[in-house]
C-alpha cells in the first residue's frame, strides 16, 4: 500500500517555516495585549445555520465553499469558514454583554473553505482576527484599523495601503442595490456567468468581479458613496477624519464591498505591494446587525481578519524571523554520563535556561560541531571522567575559552551563570536571536 498523503488543499507547516508563524503570533499578541484585547477560542465546527444566517445564503462562501456534513446525531455541522460568526455566537450564548461596556477580543486558528488551492490560499487556512463588540463609535473603526497597521509594520511590511469604503446601513444598501441593478441590467449578456447569477441575488458582489469585461462595465456604475443617508455619511466622515488625525493614509474605493453579507458602514482592506502586485493581507469592517441577526441584542461591532498564509508568503520574501537558539548546548558521552546529562538538562531548564541536549551518543568531535552550529552561547561537556570528579566542562563557543566547574557550584550559582551568558550574548550578538517587537505609534504623526 502507498503512503498516506495530506488531503488536497491542506499542508504541513514544518520548521523552519514555523518560526515565521510563531513570530507573527508573538508580535500580534504583544500589540493586542497593549490595547487590552483578550483572546477568545471558539469551536472549529458549528451548526450550519450559524453561517447561513450570519454570512448570508446568497454568498459564495455559503453557497459554494463550506465544508458541511451531517453528524451521527443527524445534526447539520459545518467547519468554520471564518471567525466572526463563531465569536458572535459565543458573545450571545455566554452572555458577554452582561459585563457591560465594550468587549475587545482577538482570535487565531484554522478555517475551512472548498476553494481551488493556490499559493496563499488553501482549503484549510489560518486567520488572525479582532472583534470590538458594543461600540458604534467611529473611533472603534479606526482603532482596529490602526492595530492592523501596527501589526503589519511591526513585522516589517512597509509598502502598505488602506482601501476604504462605506456600505452604509440597510436602507442605504437597498437604495443602492436598486440603482445598481438598473444600471447593470442592460449589460447582463456581457457580464461573466457568476455576475449574471448575482445580478438579482447579490448585485453588490459584482463590484469585485475579476472578469475583465465586467470590471470595465463596473467602472461607470453608480457609487454607493452617493447613496449614503445622513447618519451613514456622518459616521464615514468621522472615520476619515480620525484616520487623517492619526496620519493613516487611505484611498476611497467605492467598489470595495467585501465578500460577506453582514458588513455595514465601514469596509476596508489593508493591502501590500511588497510582492509587486497589490495583495490584501487584512480585511474587515463594521457589522452592526450581526449580533441581532443571530438572536442577540442589538449590538454594534467592528473587526478584521488577516490571512496568515498570505502574510507568511510576504514575510518569507522579505526577512528571516528570529529563530529560537539555546543558551547552552549539553554534550555527553559515556555509560554514566549520558543519563546524568538528561538530569542536568532538566534542572537547568527548570531554572529558566534554554538547553539543547545532544541525544546522538556520537563522538565528542561530532557533538562539538553540532554545538557550533546550534547558535548556543556555551557548551557543557559531561563525560564519565567528569561524573567521577563531580565536575563539568564549560566551553564558550565564541571565543573558545574553557573552564572546569564543580557541578554543585554550577547549580548553586545559576544567577551568576545567567549573568555571564547575558554578557556573552551582548558581546557576540550573532550567537542568538530573540523576538523583538517594534510598533509604529500613530501618535508620532500628531503635531
Swiss-Prot record:
Which UniProt keywords are present, listed alphabetically?
Answer: Aminoacyl-tRNA synthetase, ATP-binding, Cytoplasm, Ligase, Nucleotide-binding, Protein biosynthesis
List the molecular function annotations (GO) for this entry. Answer: ATP binding; histidine-tRNA ligase activity
What is the name of this protein? Histidine--tRNA ligase
**Family annotation (HAMAP family):** His_tRNA_synth
- EC number assigned by the record: 6.1.1.21
- GO BP of this protein: histidyl-tRNA aminoacylation
Keyword Repeat among UniProt keywords: no
Q: Which Pfam families match?
A: HGTP_anticodon, tRNA-synt_His
Q: What NCBIfam families is this protein classified in?
A: hisS
Q: Where is it predominantly found? A: cytoplasm
Query: Superkingdom of the source?
Result: Bacteria
Q: Where in the cell is it found?
A: Cytoplasm
Q: Quickly give the catalysed reaction.
A: tRNA(His) + L-histidine + ATP = L-histidyl-tRNA(His) + AMP + diphosphate + H(+)
- What Gene Ontology terms describe where this protein resides (cellular component)? cytoplasm
Question: How would you summarize the oligomeric state and partners of this protein?
Answer: Homodimer.
Q: Which family does it belong to?
A: Belongs to the class-II aminoacyl-tRNA synthetase family.
Amino acid at each position: 500500500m502507498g503512503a498516506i498523503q495530506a488531503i488536497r488543499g491542506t499542508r504541513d507547516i514544518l520548521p523552519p517555516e514555523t518560526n515565521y508563524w510563531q513570530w507573527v503570533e508573538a508580535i500580534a499578541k504583544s500589540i493586542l495585549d497593549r490595547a487590552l484585547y483578550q483572546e477568545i477560542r471558539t469551536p472549529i465546527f458549528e451548526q450550519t445555520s450559524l453561517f447561513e444566517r450570519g454570512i448570508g445564503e446568497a454568498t459564495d462562501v455559503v453557497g459554494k465553499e463550506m465544508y458541511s456534513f451531517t453528524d451521527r446525531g443527524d445534526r447539520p455541522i459545518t467547519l468554520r469558514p471564518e471567525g466572526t460568526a463563531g465569536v458572535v455566537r459565543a458573545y450571545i450564548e455566554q452572555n458577554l454583554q452582561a459585563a457591560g461596556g465594550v468587549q475587545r477580543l482577538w482570535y487565531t486558528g484554522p478555517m475551512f473553505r472548498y476553494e481551488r488551492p493556490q499559493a496563499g490560499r488553501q482549503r484549510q487556512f489560518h486567520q488572525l482576527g479582532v472583534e470590538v463588540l458594543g461600540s458604534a463609535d467611529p473611533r472603534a473603526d479606526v482603532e482596529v484599523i490602526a492595530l492592523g497597521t501596527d501589526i503589519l509594520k511591526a513585522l516589517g511590511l512597509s509598502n502598505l495601503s488602506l482601501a476604504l469604503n462605506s456600505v452604509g446601513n440597510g436602507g442605504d444598501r437597498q437604495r443602492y442595490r436598486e440603482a445598481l441593478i438598473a444600471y447593470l441590467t442592460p449589460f447582463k449578456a456581457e457580464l461573466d456567468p457568476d455576475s449574471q447569477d448575482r445580478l438579482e441575488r447579490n448585485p453588490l458582489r459584482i463590484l469585485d468581479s475579476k472578469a475583465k469585461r465586467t470590471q470595465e462595465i463596473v467602472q461607470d456604475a453608480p457609487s454607493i458613496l452617493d447613496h449614503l443617508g445622513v447618519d451613514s455619511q456622518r459616521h464615514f466622515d468621522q472615520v476619515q477624519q480620525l484616520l487623517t488625525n492619526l496620519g493613516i493614509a487611505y484611498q476611497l474605493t467605492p467598489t470595495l464591498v467585501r465578500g460577506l453579507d453582514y458588513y455595514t458602514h465601514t469596509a476596508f482592506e489593508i493591502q501590500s505591494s511588497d510582492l509587486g502586485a497589490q495583495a490584501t493581507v487584512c480585511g474587515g469592517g463594521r457589522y452592526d446587525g450581526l449580533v441581532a441577526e443571530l438572536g442577540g441584542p442589538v449590538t454594534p461591532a467592528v473587526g478584521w481578519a488577516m490571512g496568515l498564509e498570505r502574510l507568511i508568503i510576504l514575510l518569507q520574501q522579505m526577512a528571516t524571523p528570529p529563530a529560537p537558539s539555546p543558551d547552552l548546548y549539553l554534550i555527553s558521552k559515556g555509560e554514566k554520563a549520558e543519563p546524568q546529562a538528561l538530569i542536568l538538562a532538566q534542572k537547568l531548564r527548570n531554572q529558566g535556561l534554554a538547553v539543547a541536549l545532544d541525544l546522538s551518543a556520537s563522538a565528542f568531535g561530532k557533538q562539538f560541531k553540532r554545538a557550533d552550529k546550534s547558535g548556543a552561547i556555551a557548551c557543557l561537556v559531561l563525560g564519565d571522567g567528569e561524573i567521577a570528579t563531580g565536575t563539568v566542562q564549560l566551553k564558550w563557543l565564541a571565543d573558545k575559552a574553557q573552564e572546569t566547574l564543580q557541578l554543585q557550584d554550577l547549580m548553586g550559582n545559576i544567577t551568576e551563570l545567567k549573568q555571564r551568558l547575558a554578557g556573552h550574548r551582548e558581546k557576540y550578538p550573532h550567537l542568538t536571536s530573540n523576538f523583538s517587537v517594534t510598533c509604529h505609534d500613530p501618535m508620532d504623526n500628531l503635531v
